[in-house]
Swiss-Prot record:
Entry domain remark: The J domain is necessary and sufficient to stimulate DnaK ATPase activity. Zinc center 1 plays an important role in the autonomous, DnaK-independent chaperone activity of DnaJ. Zinc center 2 is essential for interaction with DnaK and for DnaJ activity.
Keywords: Chaperone, Cytoplasm, DNA replication, Metal-binding, Repeat, Stress response, Zinc, Zinc-finger
J domain mapped to chain residues: 5-70
Cysteines joined through disulfide linkages: none
Subunit structure: Homodimer.
Function of the protein: Participates actively in the response to hyperosmotic and heat shock by preventing the aggregation of stress-denatured proteins and by disaggregating proteins, also in an autonomous, DnaK-independent fashion. Unfolded proteins bind initially to DnaJ; upon interaction with the DnaJ-bound protein, DnaK hydrolyzes its bound ATP, resulting in the formation of a stable complex. GrpE releases ADP from DnaK; ATP binding to DnaK triggers the release of the substrate protein, thus completing the reaction cycle.
Source organism: Xanthomonas euvesicatoria pv. vesicatoria (strain 85-10)
Protein name (Swiss-Prot/TrEMBL): Chaperone protein DnaJ
A Pfam family per the record: DnaJ
UniProt: Zn(2+) 1 binding residues: C144, C147, C196, C199
Length: 375
């Protein structure tokens, strides 16, 4: 039986471009694929015909030989680089189904890489605010030095006969085909006959890796620093993973952080609160002063602009908020106690209301409450 013209099989003109040939082959292969036509001998024959036509026309040398001599180019040892043997169906159908489901085709072991590694870096607030360079040590998998990651003692590897070097095999599920890691070579695509004595064929060994990390100024808890290629070494010489360093800032004895702002409490004496005063407060950049006006109450906030944290993103500076707390005196001397008693004696009648309005309001509220309860 004479063969059909390859261009006719694919439904393209003789001057068709490589892209037109590929699209035509996709249509033909999808239409006649055995998975879509189970038990249909005619469809299976048409599928093989499409495959053979594309294998010839997609190869520049074979196409030129075919254009010059037709099917005779591949008979009786004539030129053209050998007869049609079939394209890599994994690549073709990776393209087809990748386009359908939104993914791209993956070449042999293209998706394999080393695992990413996580590390928690604890910093003091001062270190996080100023930035720091820190050396860390992480246990991870690194490339085996004696075999350079190949896993082979003599550097020789063989292509896996099961997956033909792809690292994946196709599994049929009804009319659908799935890909999974090749069980024969464990997804490597190669087989090692003489395993490396150091890594036992794995191509990787466990090691404590020492790295120097530059932490930028202004980082906060939860920020992550990515170090590309510093994760686990990839299997069989594939690319390494990444290292993700997560920052965790320790609690501070004085300051509490809220984004780029800092908060602290400033205790003051009763006399300072009543009469007013100037007090010195700590900041991350040194000391500063805040002026306490007379009659200041507990909870009043004083804002020191630019005394917070310089943002790691915008480089603007946050503020420092100082909350004053009026401290009740303790361990009083006899003289101090007597003075306070004399002072308290002045709070009588309307003077008490005038000098302690909140206390008077509270007492009035309590009295009104009990009056309503007992009436």
């Amino acid at each position: 039986m004479s063969k059909r013209d390859y261009y006719e099989v694919l439904g393209v003109a003789r001057g068709a471009s490589d892209e037109e040939l590929k699209k035509a082959y996709r249509r033909c292969a999808m239409k006649h694929h055995p998975d879509r036509n189970p038990g249909d001998a005619a469809a299976e024959a048409a599928f093989k015909e499409c495959k053979e036509a594309y294998e010839v026309l997609s190869d520049g040398n074979k196409r030129r030989a075919y254009d010059a001599h037709g099917h005779a180019a591949f008979e009786h040892g004539m030129g053209g680089g050998g007869g049609p043997g079939g394209p890599d169906m994994g690549d073709i159908f990776g393209d087809i189904f990748g386009n359908i489901f939104g993914g791209g085709a993956a070449g042999p072991r293209a998706a394999r890489r080393g695992a990413d590694v996580g590390y928690v870096l604890e910093l003091d607030l001062e270190e996080a605010v100023a930035g720091i360079e820190r050396r860390i040590e992480i246990p991870t998998l690194v490339e085996c030095a004696p075999c350079h990651g190949s896993g082979s003692e003599d550097g020789k590897v063989e292509t896996c006969g099961t997956c033909h070097g792809r690292g994946q095999v196709r599994i049929q599920r009804g009319i659908f085909a799935m890909q999974q890691s090749c069980p024969h070579c464990d997804g490597r695509g190669t087989l090692i006959q003489n395993p490396c004595k150091t890594c036992h064929g794995a191509g990787r060994v466990e090691e404590d890796k020492v790295l120097s990390i530059k932490v930028p100024a202004g980082v906060d808890t939860g920020d992550r620093i990515r170090l590309a290629g510093e994760g686990e070494a990839g299997p069989a010489g594939t690319p390494p993973g990444d290292l993700y360093v997560e920052v965790r800032v320790r609690e501070h004895a004085i300051f509490q952080r809220d984004g780029d702002d800092l908060h602290c409490e400033v205790p003051i004496r009763i006399s300072q609160a009543a009469l007013g005063d100037t007090v010195r407060v700590a900041t991350l950049g040194g000391e500063a002063e805040i002026r306490i006006p007379a009659e200041t109450q507990t909870g009043k906030l004083f804002r020191l602009r630019g005394k917070g944290v310089r943002s790691v993103r915008s480089r603007s500076e946050g503020d420092l908020y100082c909350r004053v707390v009026v401290e009740t005196p303790v361990n009083l001397t006899a003289d101090q106690r007597e003075l306070l008693q004399q002072f308290e004696a002045t709070f009588t009648g309307e003077d008490a209301r005038k000098h302690s309005p909140k206390s008077a309001t509270f007492i009035d509220g309590v009295k009104g409450f009990w009056d309503r309860m007992t009436s």
